[in-house]
Every structure is written in C-alpha cells, then in structure tokens.
Amino acid sequence: MSAILSTTSKSFLSRGSTRQCQNMQKALFALLNARHYSSASEQTLKERFAEIIPAKAEEIKKFKKEHGKTVIGEVLLEQAYGGMRGIKGLVWEGSVLDPEEGIRFRGRTIPEIQRELPKAEGSTEPLPEALFWLLLTGEIPTDAQVKALSADLAARSEIPEHVIQLLDSLPKDLHPMAQFSIAVTALESESKFAKAYAQGVSKKEYWSYTFEDSLDLLGKLPVIASKIYRNVFKDGKITSTDPNADYGKNLAQLLGYENKDFIDLMRLYLTIHSDHEGGNVSAHTTHLVGSALSSPYLSLAAGLNGLAGPLHGRANQEVLEWLFKLREEVKGDYSKETIEKYLWDTLNAGRVVPGYGHAVLRKTDPRYTAQREFALKHFPDYELFKLVSTIYEVAPGVLTKHGKTKNPWPNVDSHSGVLLQYYGLTEASFYTVLFGVARAIGVLPQLIIDRAVGAPIERPKSFSTEKYKELVKKIESKN
C-alpha cells in the first residue's frame, strides 16, 4: 500500500494516527477512483504518450534524414561571446517564445491556455497538471483525465524518511533553493530509471522509467517545498497531501493556506512559470544533464541550481527587495514624477531596474499581464500593486530614453512577488522554490520526450580566443 499512499512521514505530521489512517484510506480510494476514470473510457497519460510517441519518433527521424544538411542559421562571433544568445541549437517541443507575442505552449498563448485547459470546480484558473499533459502530448486532456492525473500525483507524494531527516538537519539560514536542490538530489535513491539502467534495460524502455521518475518527482515537490518553508519560517510541521485535491490546491494547503483565491493564485503561478522554451538556464541545464542519462532527479536538481541564480529565478526576490527600498525612500509618494526620478537615479547610479527587460521578449511579458489581471480582479487597491502599476506606466519610457535596453517592458518577475505578499506569503527568499516547482512542470515532459525519441548527449564545439582569432582571420581573408 505504501506505493500509493499520499501521506507524508509521521515524523513531521502534526495529525494523530487516526487522521493518518483516514488519509491512507482516502488516498487508496482516490487512486482507485482515478484508475476507474481512466480505465472506463479515458486513457491515462502514460497510455496516451505510449500511443503517440512511435509516430513522433518516426516523424523526427524522417525530418532529419530529408533535411539534416539544411542550414538553419548562422553564428556570429559576438554570439559565441554573448552567452550563445539567439543561436538555434536546441529542440524543445513544449513551448516556443516569440519576441513580440510571448510564450506559446504547444501553439497556444497564455490567454488561450487560461480559456481552454480544464479547471477545478468553481475555479477560473487552469490546472497545472493539465498543462503538464499538454506539454507532453500536445493535446488538451479531458476533465476526467486531469482528475485521474491529479490523484496519481497525490498518490506519489510520500517522501522517504532519509530526505525528511536531511531537511530537518539543514541550518535554517541555508537558502531555501539550496535546500530544495539538496532534497531533490537525495531523492535519487528512489530513481526507477537509475535502477533499470543499472540492470541493463533496453533503450526502448528508457522513456517509461523516465516517465515514472518524473511523475514521482512531480508528486513529491509540493511536499518538499512546503517542508522547507515550514522548517525555515514556521514550526516545521505540515499537513498531509489531500488525495482528492488538485496539484495547486495541495501545494497551497501544504504551505498552510486555505484561502480560495490563494489556491487559485497557485494554479495560475504554477502554470505561467512552468515553461519558457529550452534555452533558459534552468530548462537547458535540466536537458543537458539529462542528455548524459542522469535521472530526472539529478537533472532537475541541476536545473534548480541554475534557477537559483540572481540572473534567472532569483530575480523575483530581487524585484521585491528593490520595491521595498523604493517604497521606503519615496515615503508614500507614488506619483509618476517621483517614480520617474527614482528610476533615473537608479540608472544613473549604474544599476538596473529589476523586473524589466528580457533576453528574447520585446513586448510586455504576457505572464506579467496574466498576473496583473489577477491582481486587478482580486485586490486592485493593494498598495504594492498600485506601486507596481505606476512603475509600469513610467518605466518603459524612462528605459527607452536611457537607450541601453532592447526591451523596456516588464517581465514575469516584476509582478509575482506582489501577489504572494498580498496573501501573506512574505518570505521573499522562498519565492524561487515556488518557481522551481513550477519549472518542473515544463522541463520534465521534455526529458521524457528526449528519452522516447533517443535524443543524444549534448556536445557543442568550443574554441579558445586564440583559436577564434585564427578562424576569423581565415574567414576574413577569403572575403
């Protein structure tokens, strides 16, 4: 029974044995009920993926054979020295980022995702697990399929005792993202892929074990994230996973929140932070490490370490710190004139305006827009939201006049912290952990696809500066 229970270990539950027994029974019932949903008339996610992947693998094989020698772009020297920005060199099936339009998940914009994906009863926000299904298969699941997937993820949420003890032993002043990466790495003990590979499983079966690891990991992430949050900022105790709740609701409740609107925020947050094509640090790192046939646990842990950087996922924490400093210095004067002066002072001091600009986007990030619309709906008069709104009115003009950015518009990090602050989740150093839970929803489907289509290990070519000089001299002498 332990393989299908969603309750976490007794060592950190605050409920008694009777409550735990009830949760065990609920988990069993929910999983059996989910299997009924899927077996009656609907395919499970694994069944559906197994059905469609042979044709996809053949499509890729044929495409490479017929067009493998086609030139798809050129590489400039400045790109080699500039973080490979803009170089076409990765395959990422789940999403594509358009500079003007923003992200599309399997061809769908964020507003389309918000309209079309299944939702929990009474909710207006899409279910993150429905997006996981879409990213993996390219198809929108039915309500019954999502309900079965929600129950499956809840049933996989139990955390090994050694991981709990490890988290409890970590110093509270260790950054939550470091703790998150440590815990995910420690879950390698549970890897079905690693065990199967050690036993010589056929390459054709790699994807199946990667799928199982990915769903196991996804099911455990809300518990790990919440345990870190409760250890560092609260009393260390968390409740158990609700076997009948969806992914976003379980995350909210494990963190200690029952507010209906906050639960909806978690659904939205996890959805829009999940995927942003494959070239960003966390997605690329997860894919890169996975290409060496490291398990999903080790691959995601590596991606989380990249996400923890201040130039990537930790930017939302830095935005909030900057907002607080701004608020303190302007002393309640949120006029456009005051904000504009503060922005110019920031830029003239050689600092950046956090939350503005993006490596690819050249318009307002639609993820920012989705969060802004949520705030307008739920708390239009909130002080911090009003401040962010004023900055939104002023900053693009200031940044354009400053002339040192290609994109003067806000990105996703410019808004997310304000939403969390409103609902009382004020510990900014934890925000990137939530980002990490969301990012798993985007990167794990690609790992499964990589193994299913036999993607090779990643190995680009590197040159030293001297070698590049030789190459440039040779090229220029021919022109």
UniProtKB/Swiss-Prot annotation:
Where does this chain mainly localize? Answer: mitochondrion
Transit peptide: which range? 1-37
Q: Supply the Gene3D superfamilies for this chain.
A: Citrate Synthase, domain 1 (1.10.580.10), Cytochrome P450-Terp, domain 2 (1.10.230.10)
Catalytic activity of the protein: oxaloacetate + acetyl-CoA + H2O = citrate + CoA + H(+)
List locations, semicolon-separated: Mitochondrion matrix
Q: Which InterPro entries match?
A: Citrate_synth-like_lrg_a-sub, Citrate_synth-like_sm_a-sub, Citrate_synthase, Citrate_synthase_AS, Citrate_synthase_euk, Citrate_synthase_sf
Broad EC category: transferase
Outcome of mutating S462A: Loss of phosphorylation. Greatly increases catalytic activity and promotes homodimerization
One record GO biological process: citrate metabolic process
Question: Which Pfam families would you find in this protein's record?
Answer: Citrate_synt
Q: Does the keyword Metal-binding apply?
A: no
| Superkingdom to which the source organism belongs | Eukaryota
Q: How is its activity regulated?
A: Phosphorylation at Ser-462 inhibits catalytic activity. Dephosphorylation at Ser-462 by PTC7 enhances catalytic activity.
Q: Phosphoserine modification sites?
A: S462
The biological pathway it contributes to is: Carbohydrate metabolism; tricarboxylic acid cycle; isocitrate from oxaloacetate: step 1/2
EC number, as in UniProt: 2.3.3.1
One GO term describing the cellular component = mitochondrial matrix
Entry keyword Phosphoprotein: yes
What more the UniProt record tells us is: Citrate synthase is found in nearly all cells capable of oxidative metabolism.
Family membership, please give it.
Answer: Belongs to the citrate synthase family.
Name the NCBIfam families on file.
cit_synth_euk, PRK09569.1
How this chain assembles, per its entry, is: Monomer and homodimer. Exists as an inactive monomer when phosphorylated. Homodimerization is dependent on dephosphorylation of Ser-462 by PTC7 and is required for activity.
Function in brief: Specific citrate synthase with catalytic activity only with acetyl-CoA.
Query: What is this protein identified as?
Result: Citrate synthase, mitochondrial
Q: Give the organism the record lists.
A: Saccharomyces cerevisiae (strain ATCC 204508 / S288c)
